[in-house]
């Protein structure tokens, strides 16, 4: 799906040091990382540079909730992530199994990041239809929800829902800056400066070099850049 996927660190290299070096190179103060063993070690080395998220499968309802509670207590977890189309069986955004997870996130003051729109892998994608977020936002007004990976082809609907629901946000993960949806950028430049924020896809599909080479061409207004690159993520993920 991606061209020029970043090369992994050479065998024998320290992936944590390599990642910190890339962050330094592009002026990245803090990154959100999945809670892998390497990410836990990176957080031990430099807690201020590493915030942690946890991917869970809500099919194991109580098991997922216990994992989230433990990660919050032990590792200062900042977000839970959910890939509805990638669960087996699939768990739609508005499924009762996901609702149990959302309730736990409200109790623990955690943001939840959910894939929205057509999935990249060749999976059925109705479970990620953007309209499903409407009911979730209604039922969980305290929940901080972030749509990730595009929300296409329903990006205009995503904007309408962000206008409607205070807790719904959008991050630009999975897309090179030149392909950010126009409807989302237009929204960020007008009524959504506090709702849209940067996310990359390093090292899964995009190099930081490509991302930061293309970012200056994104037509954001001057006052939108600070919320887009820093302030919105710090607020949504409760970063210090």
What kind of feature is each model-predicted range?
Residues 12-22, 60-72, 155:
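Short, acidic/polar
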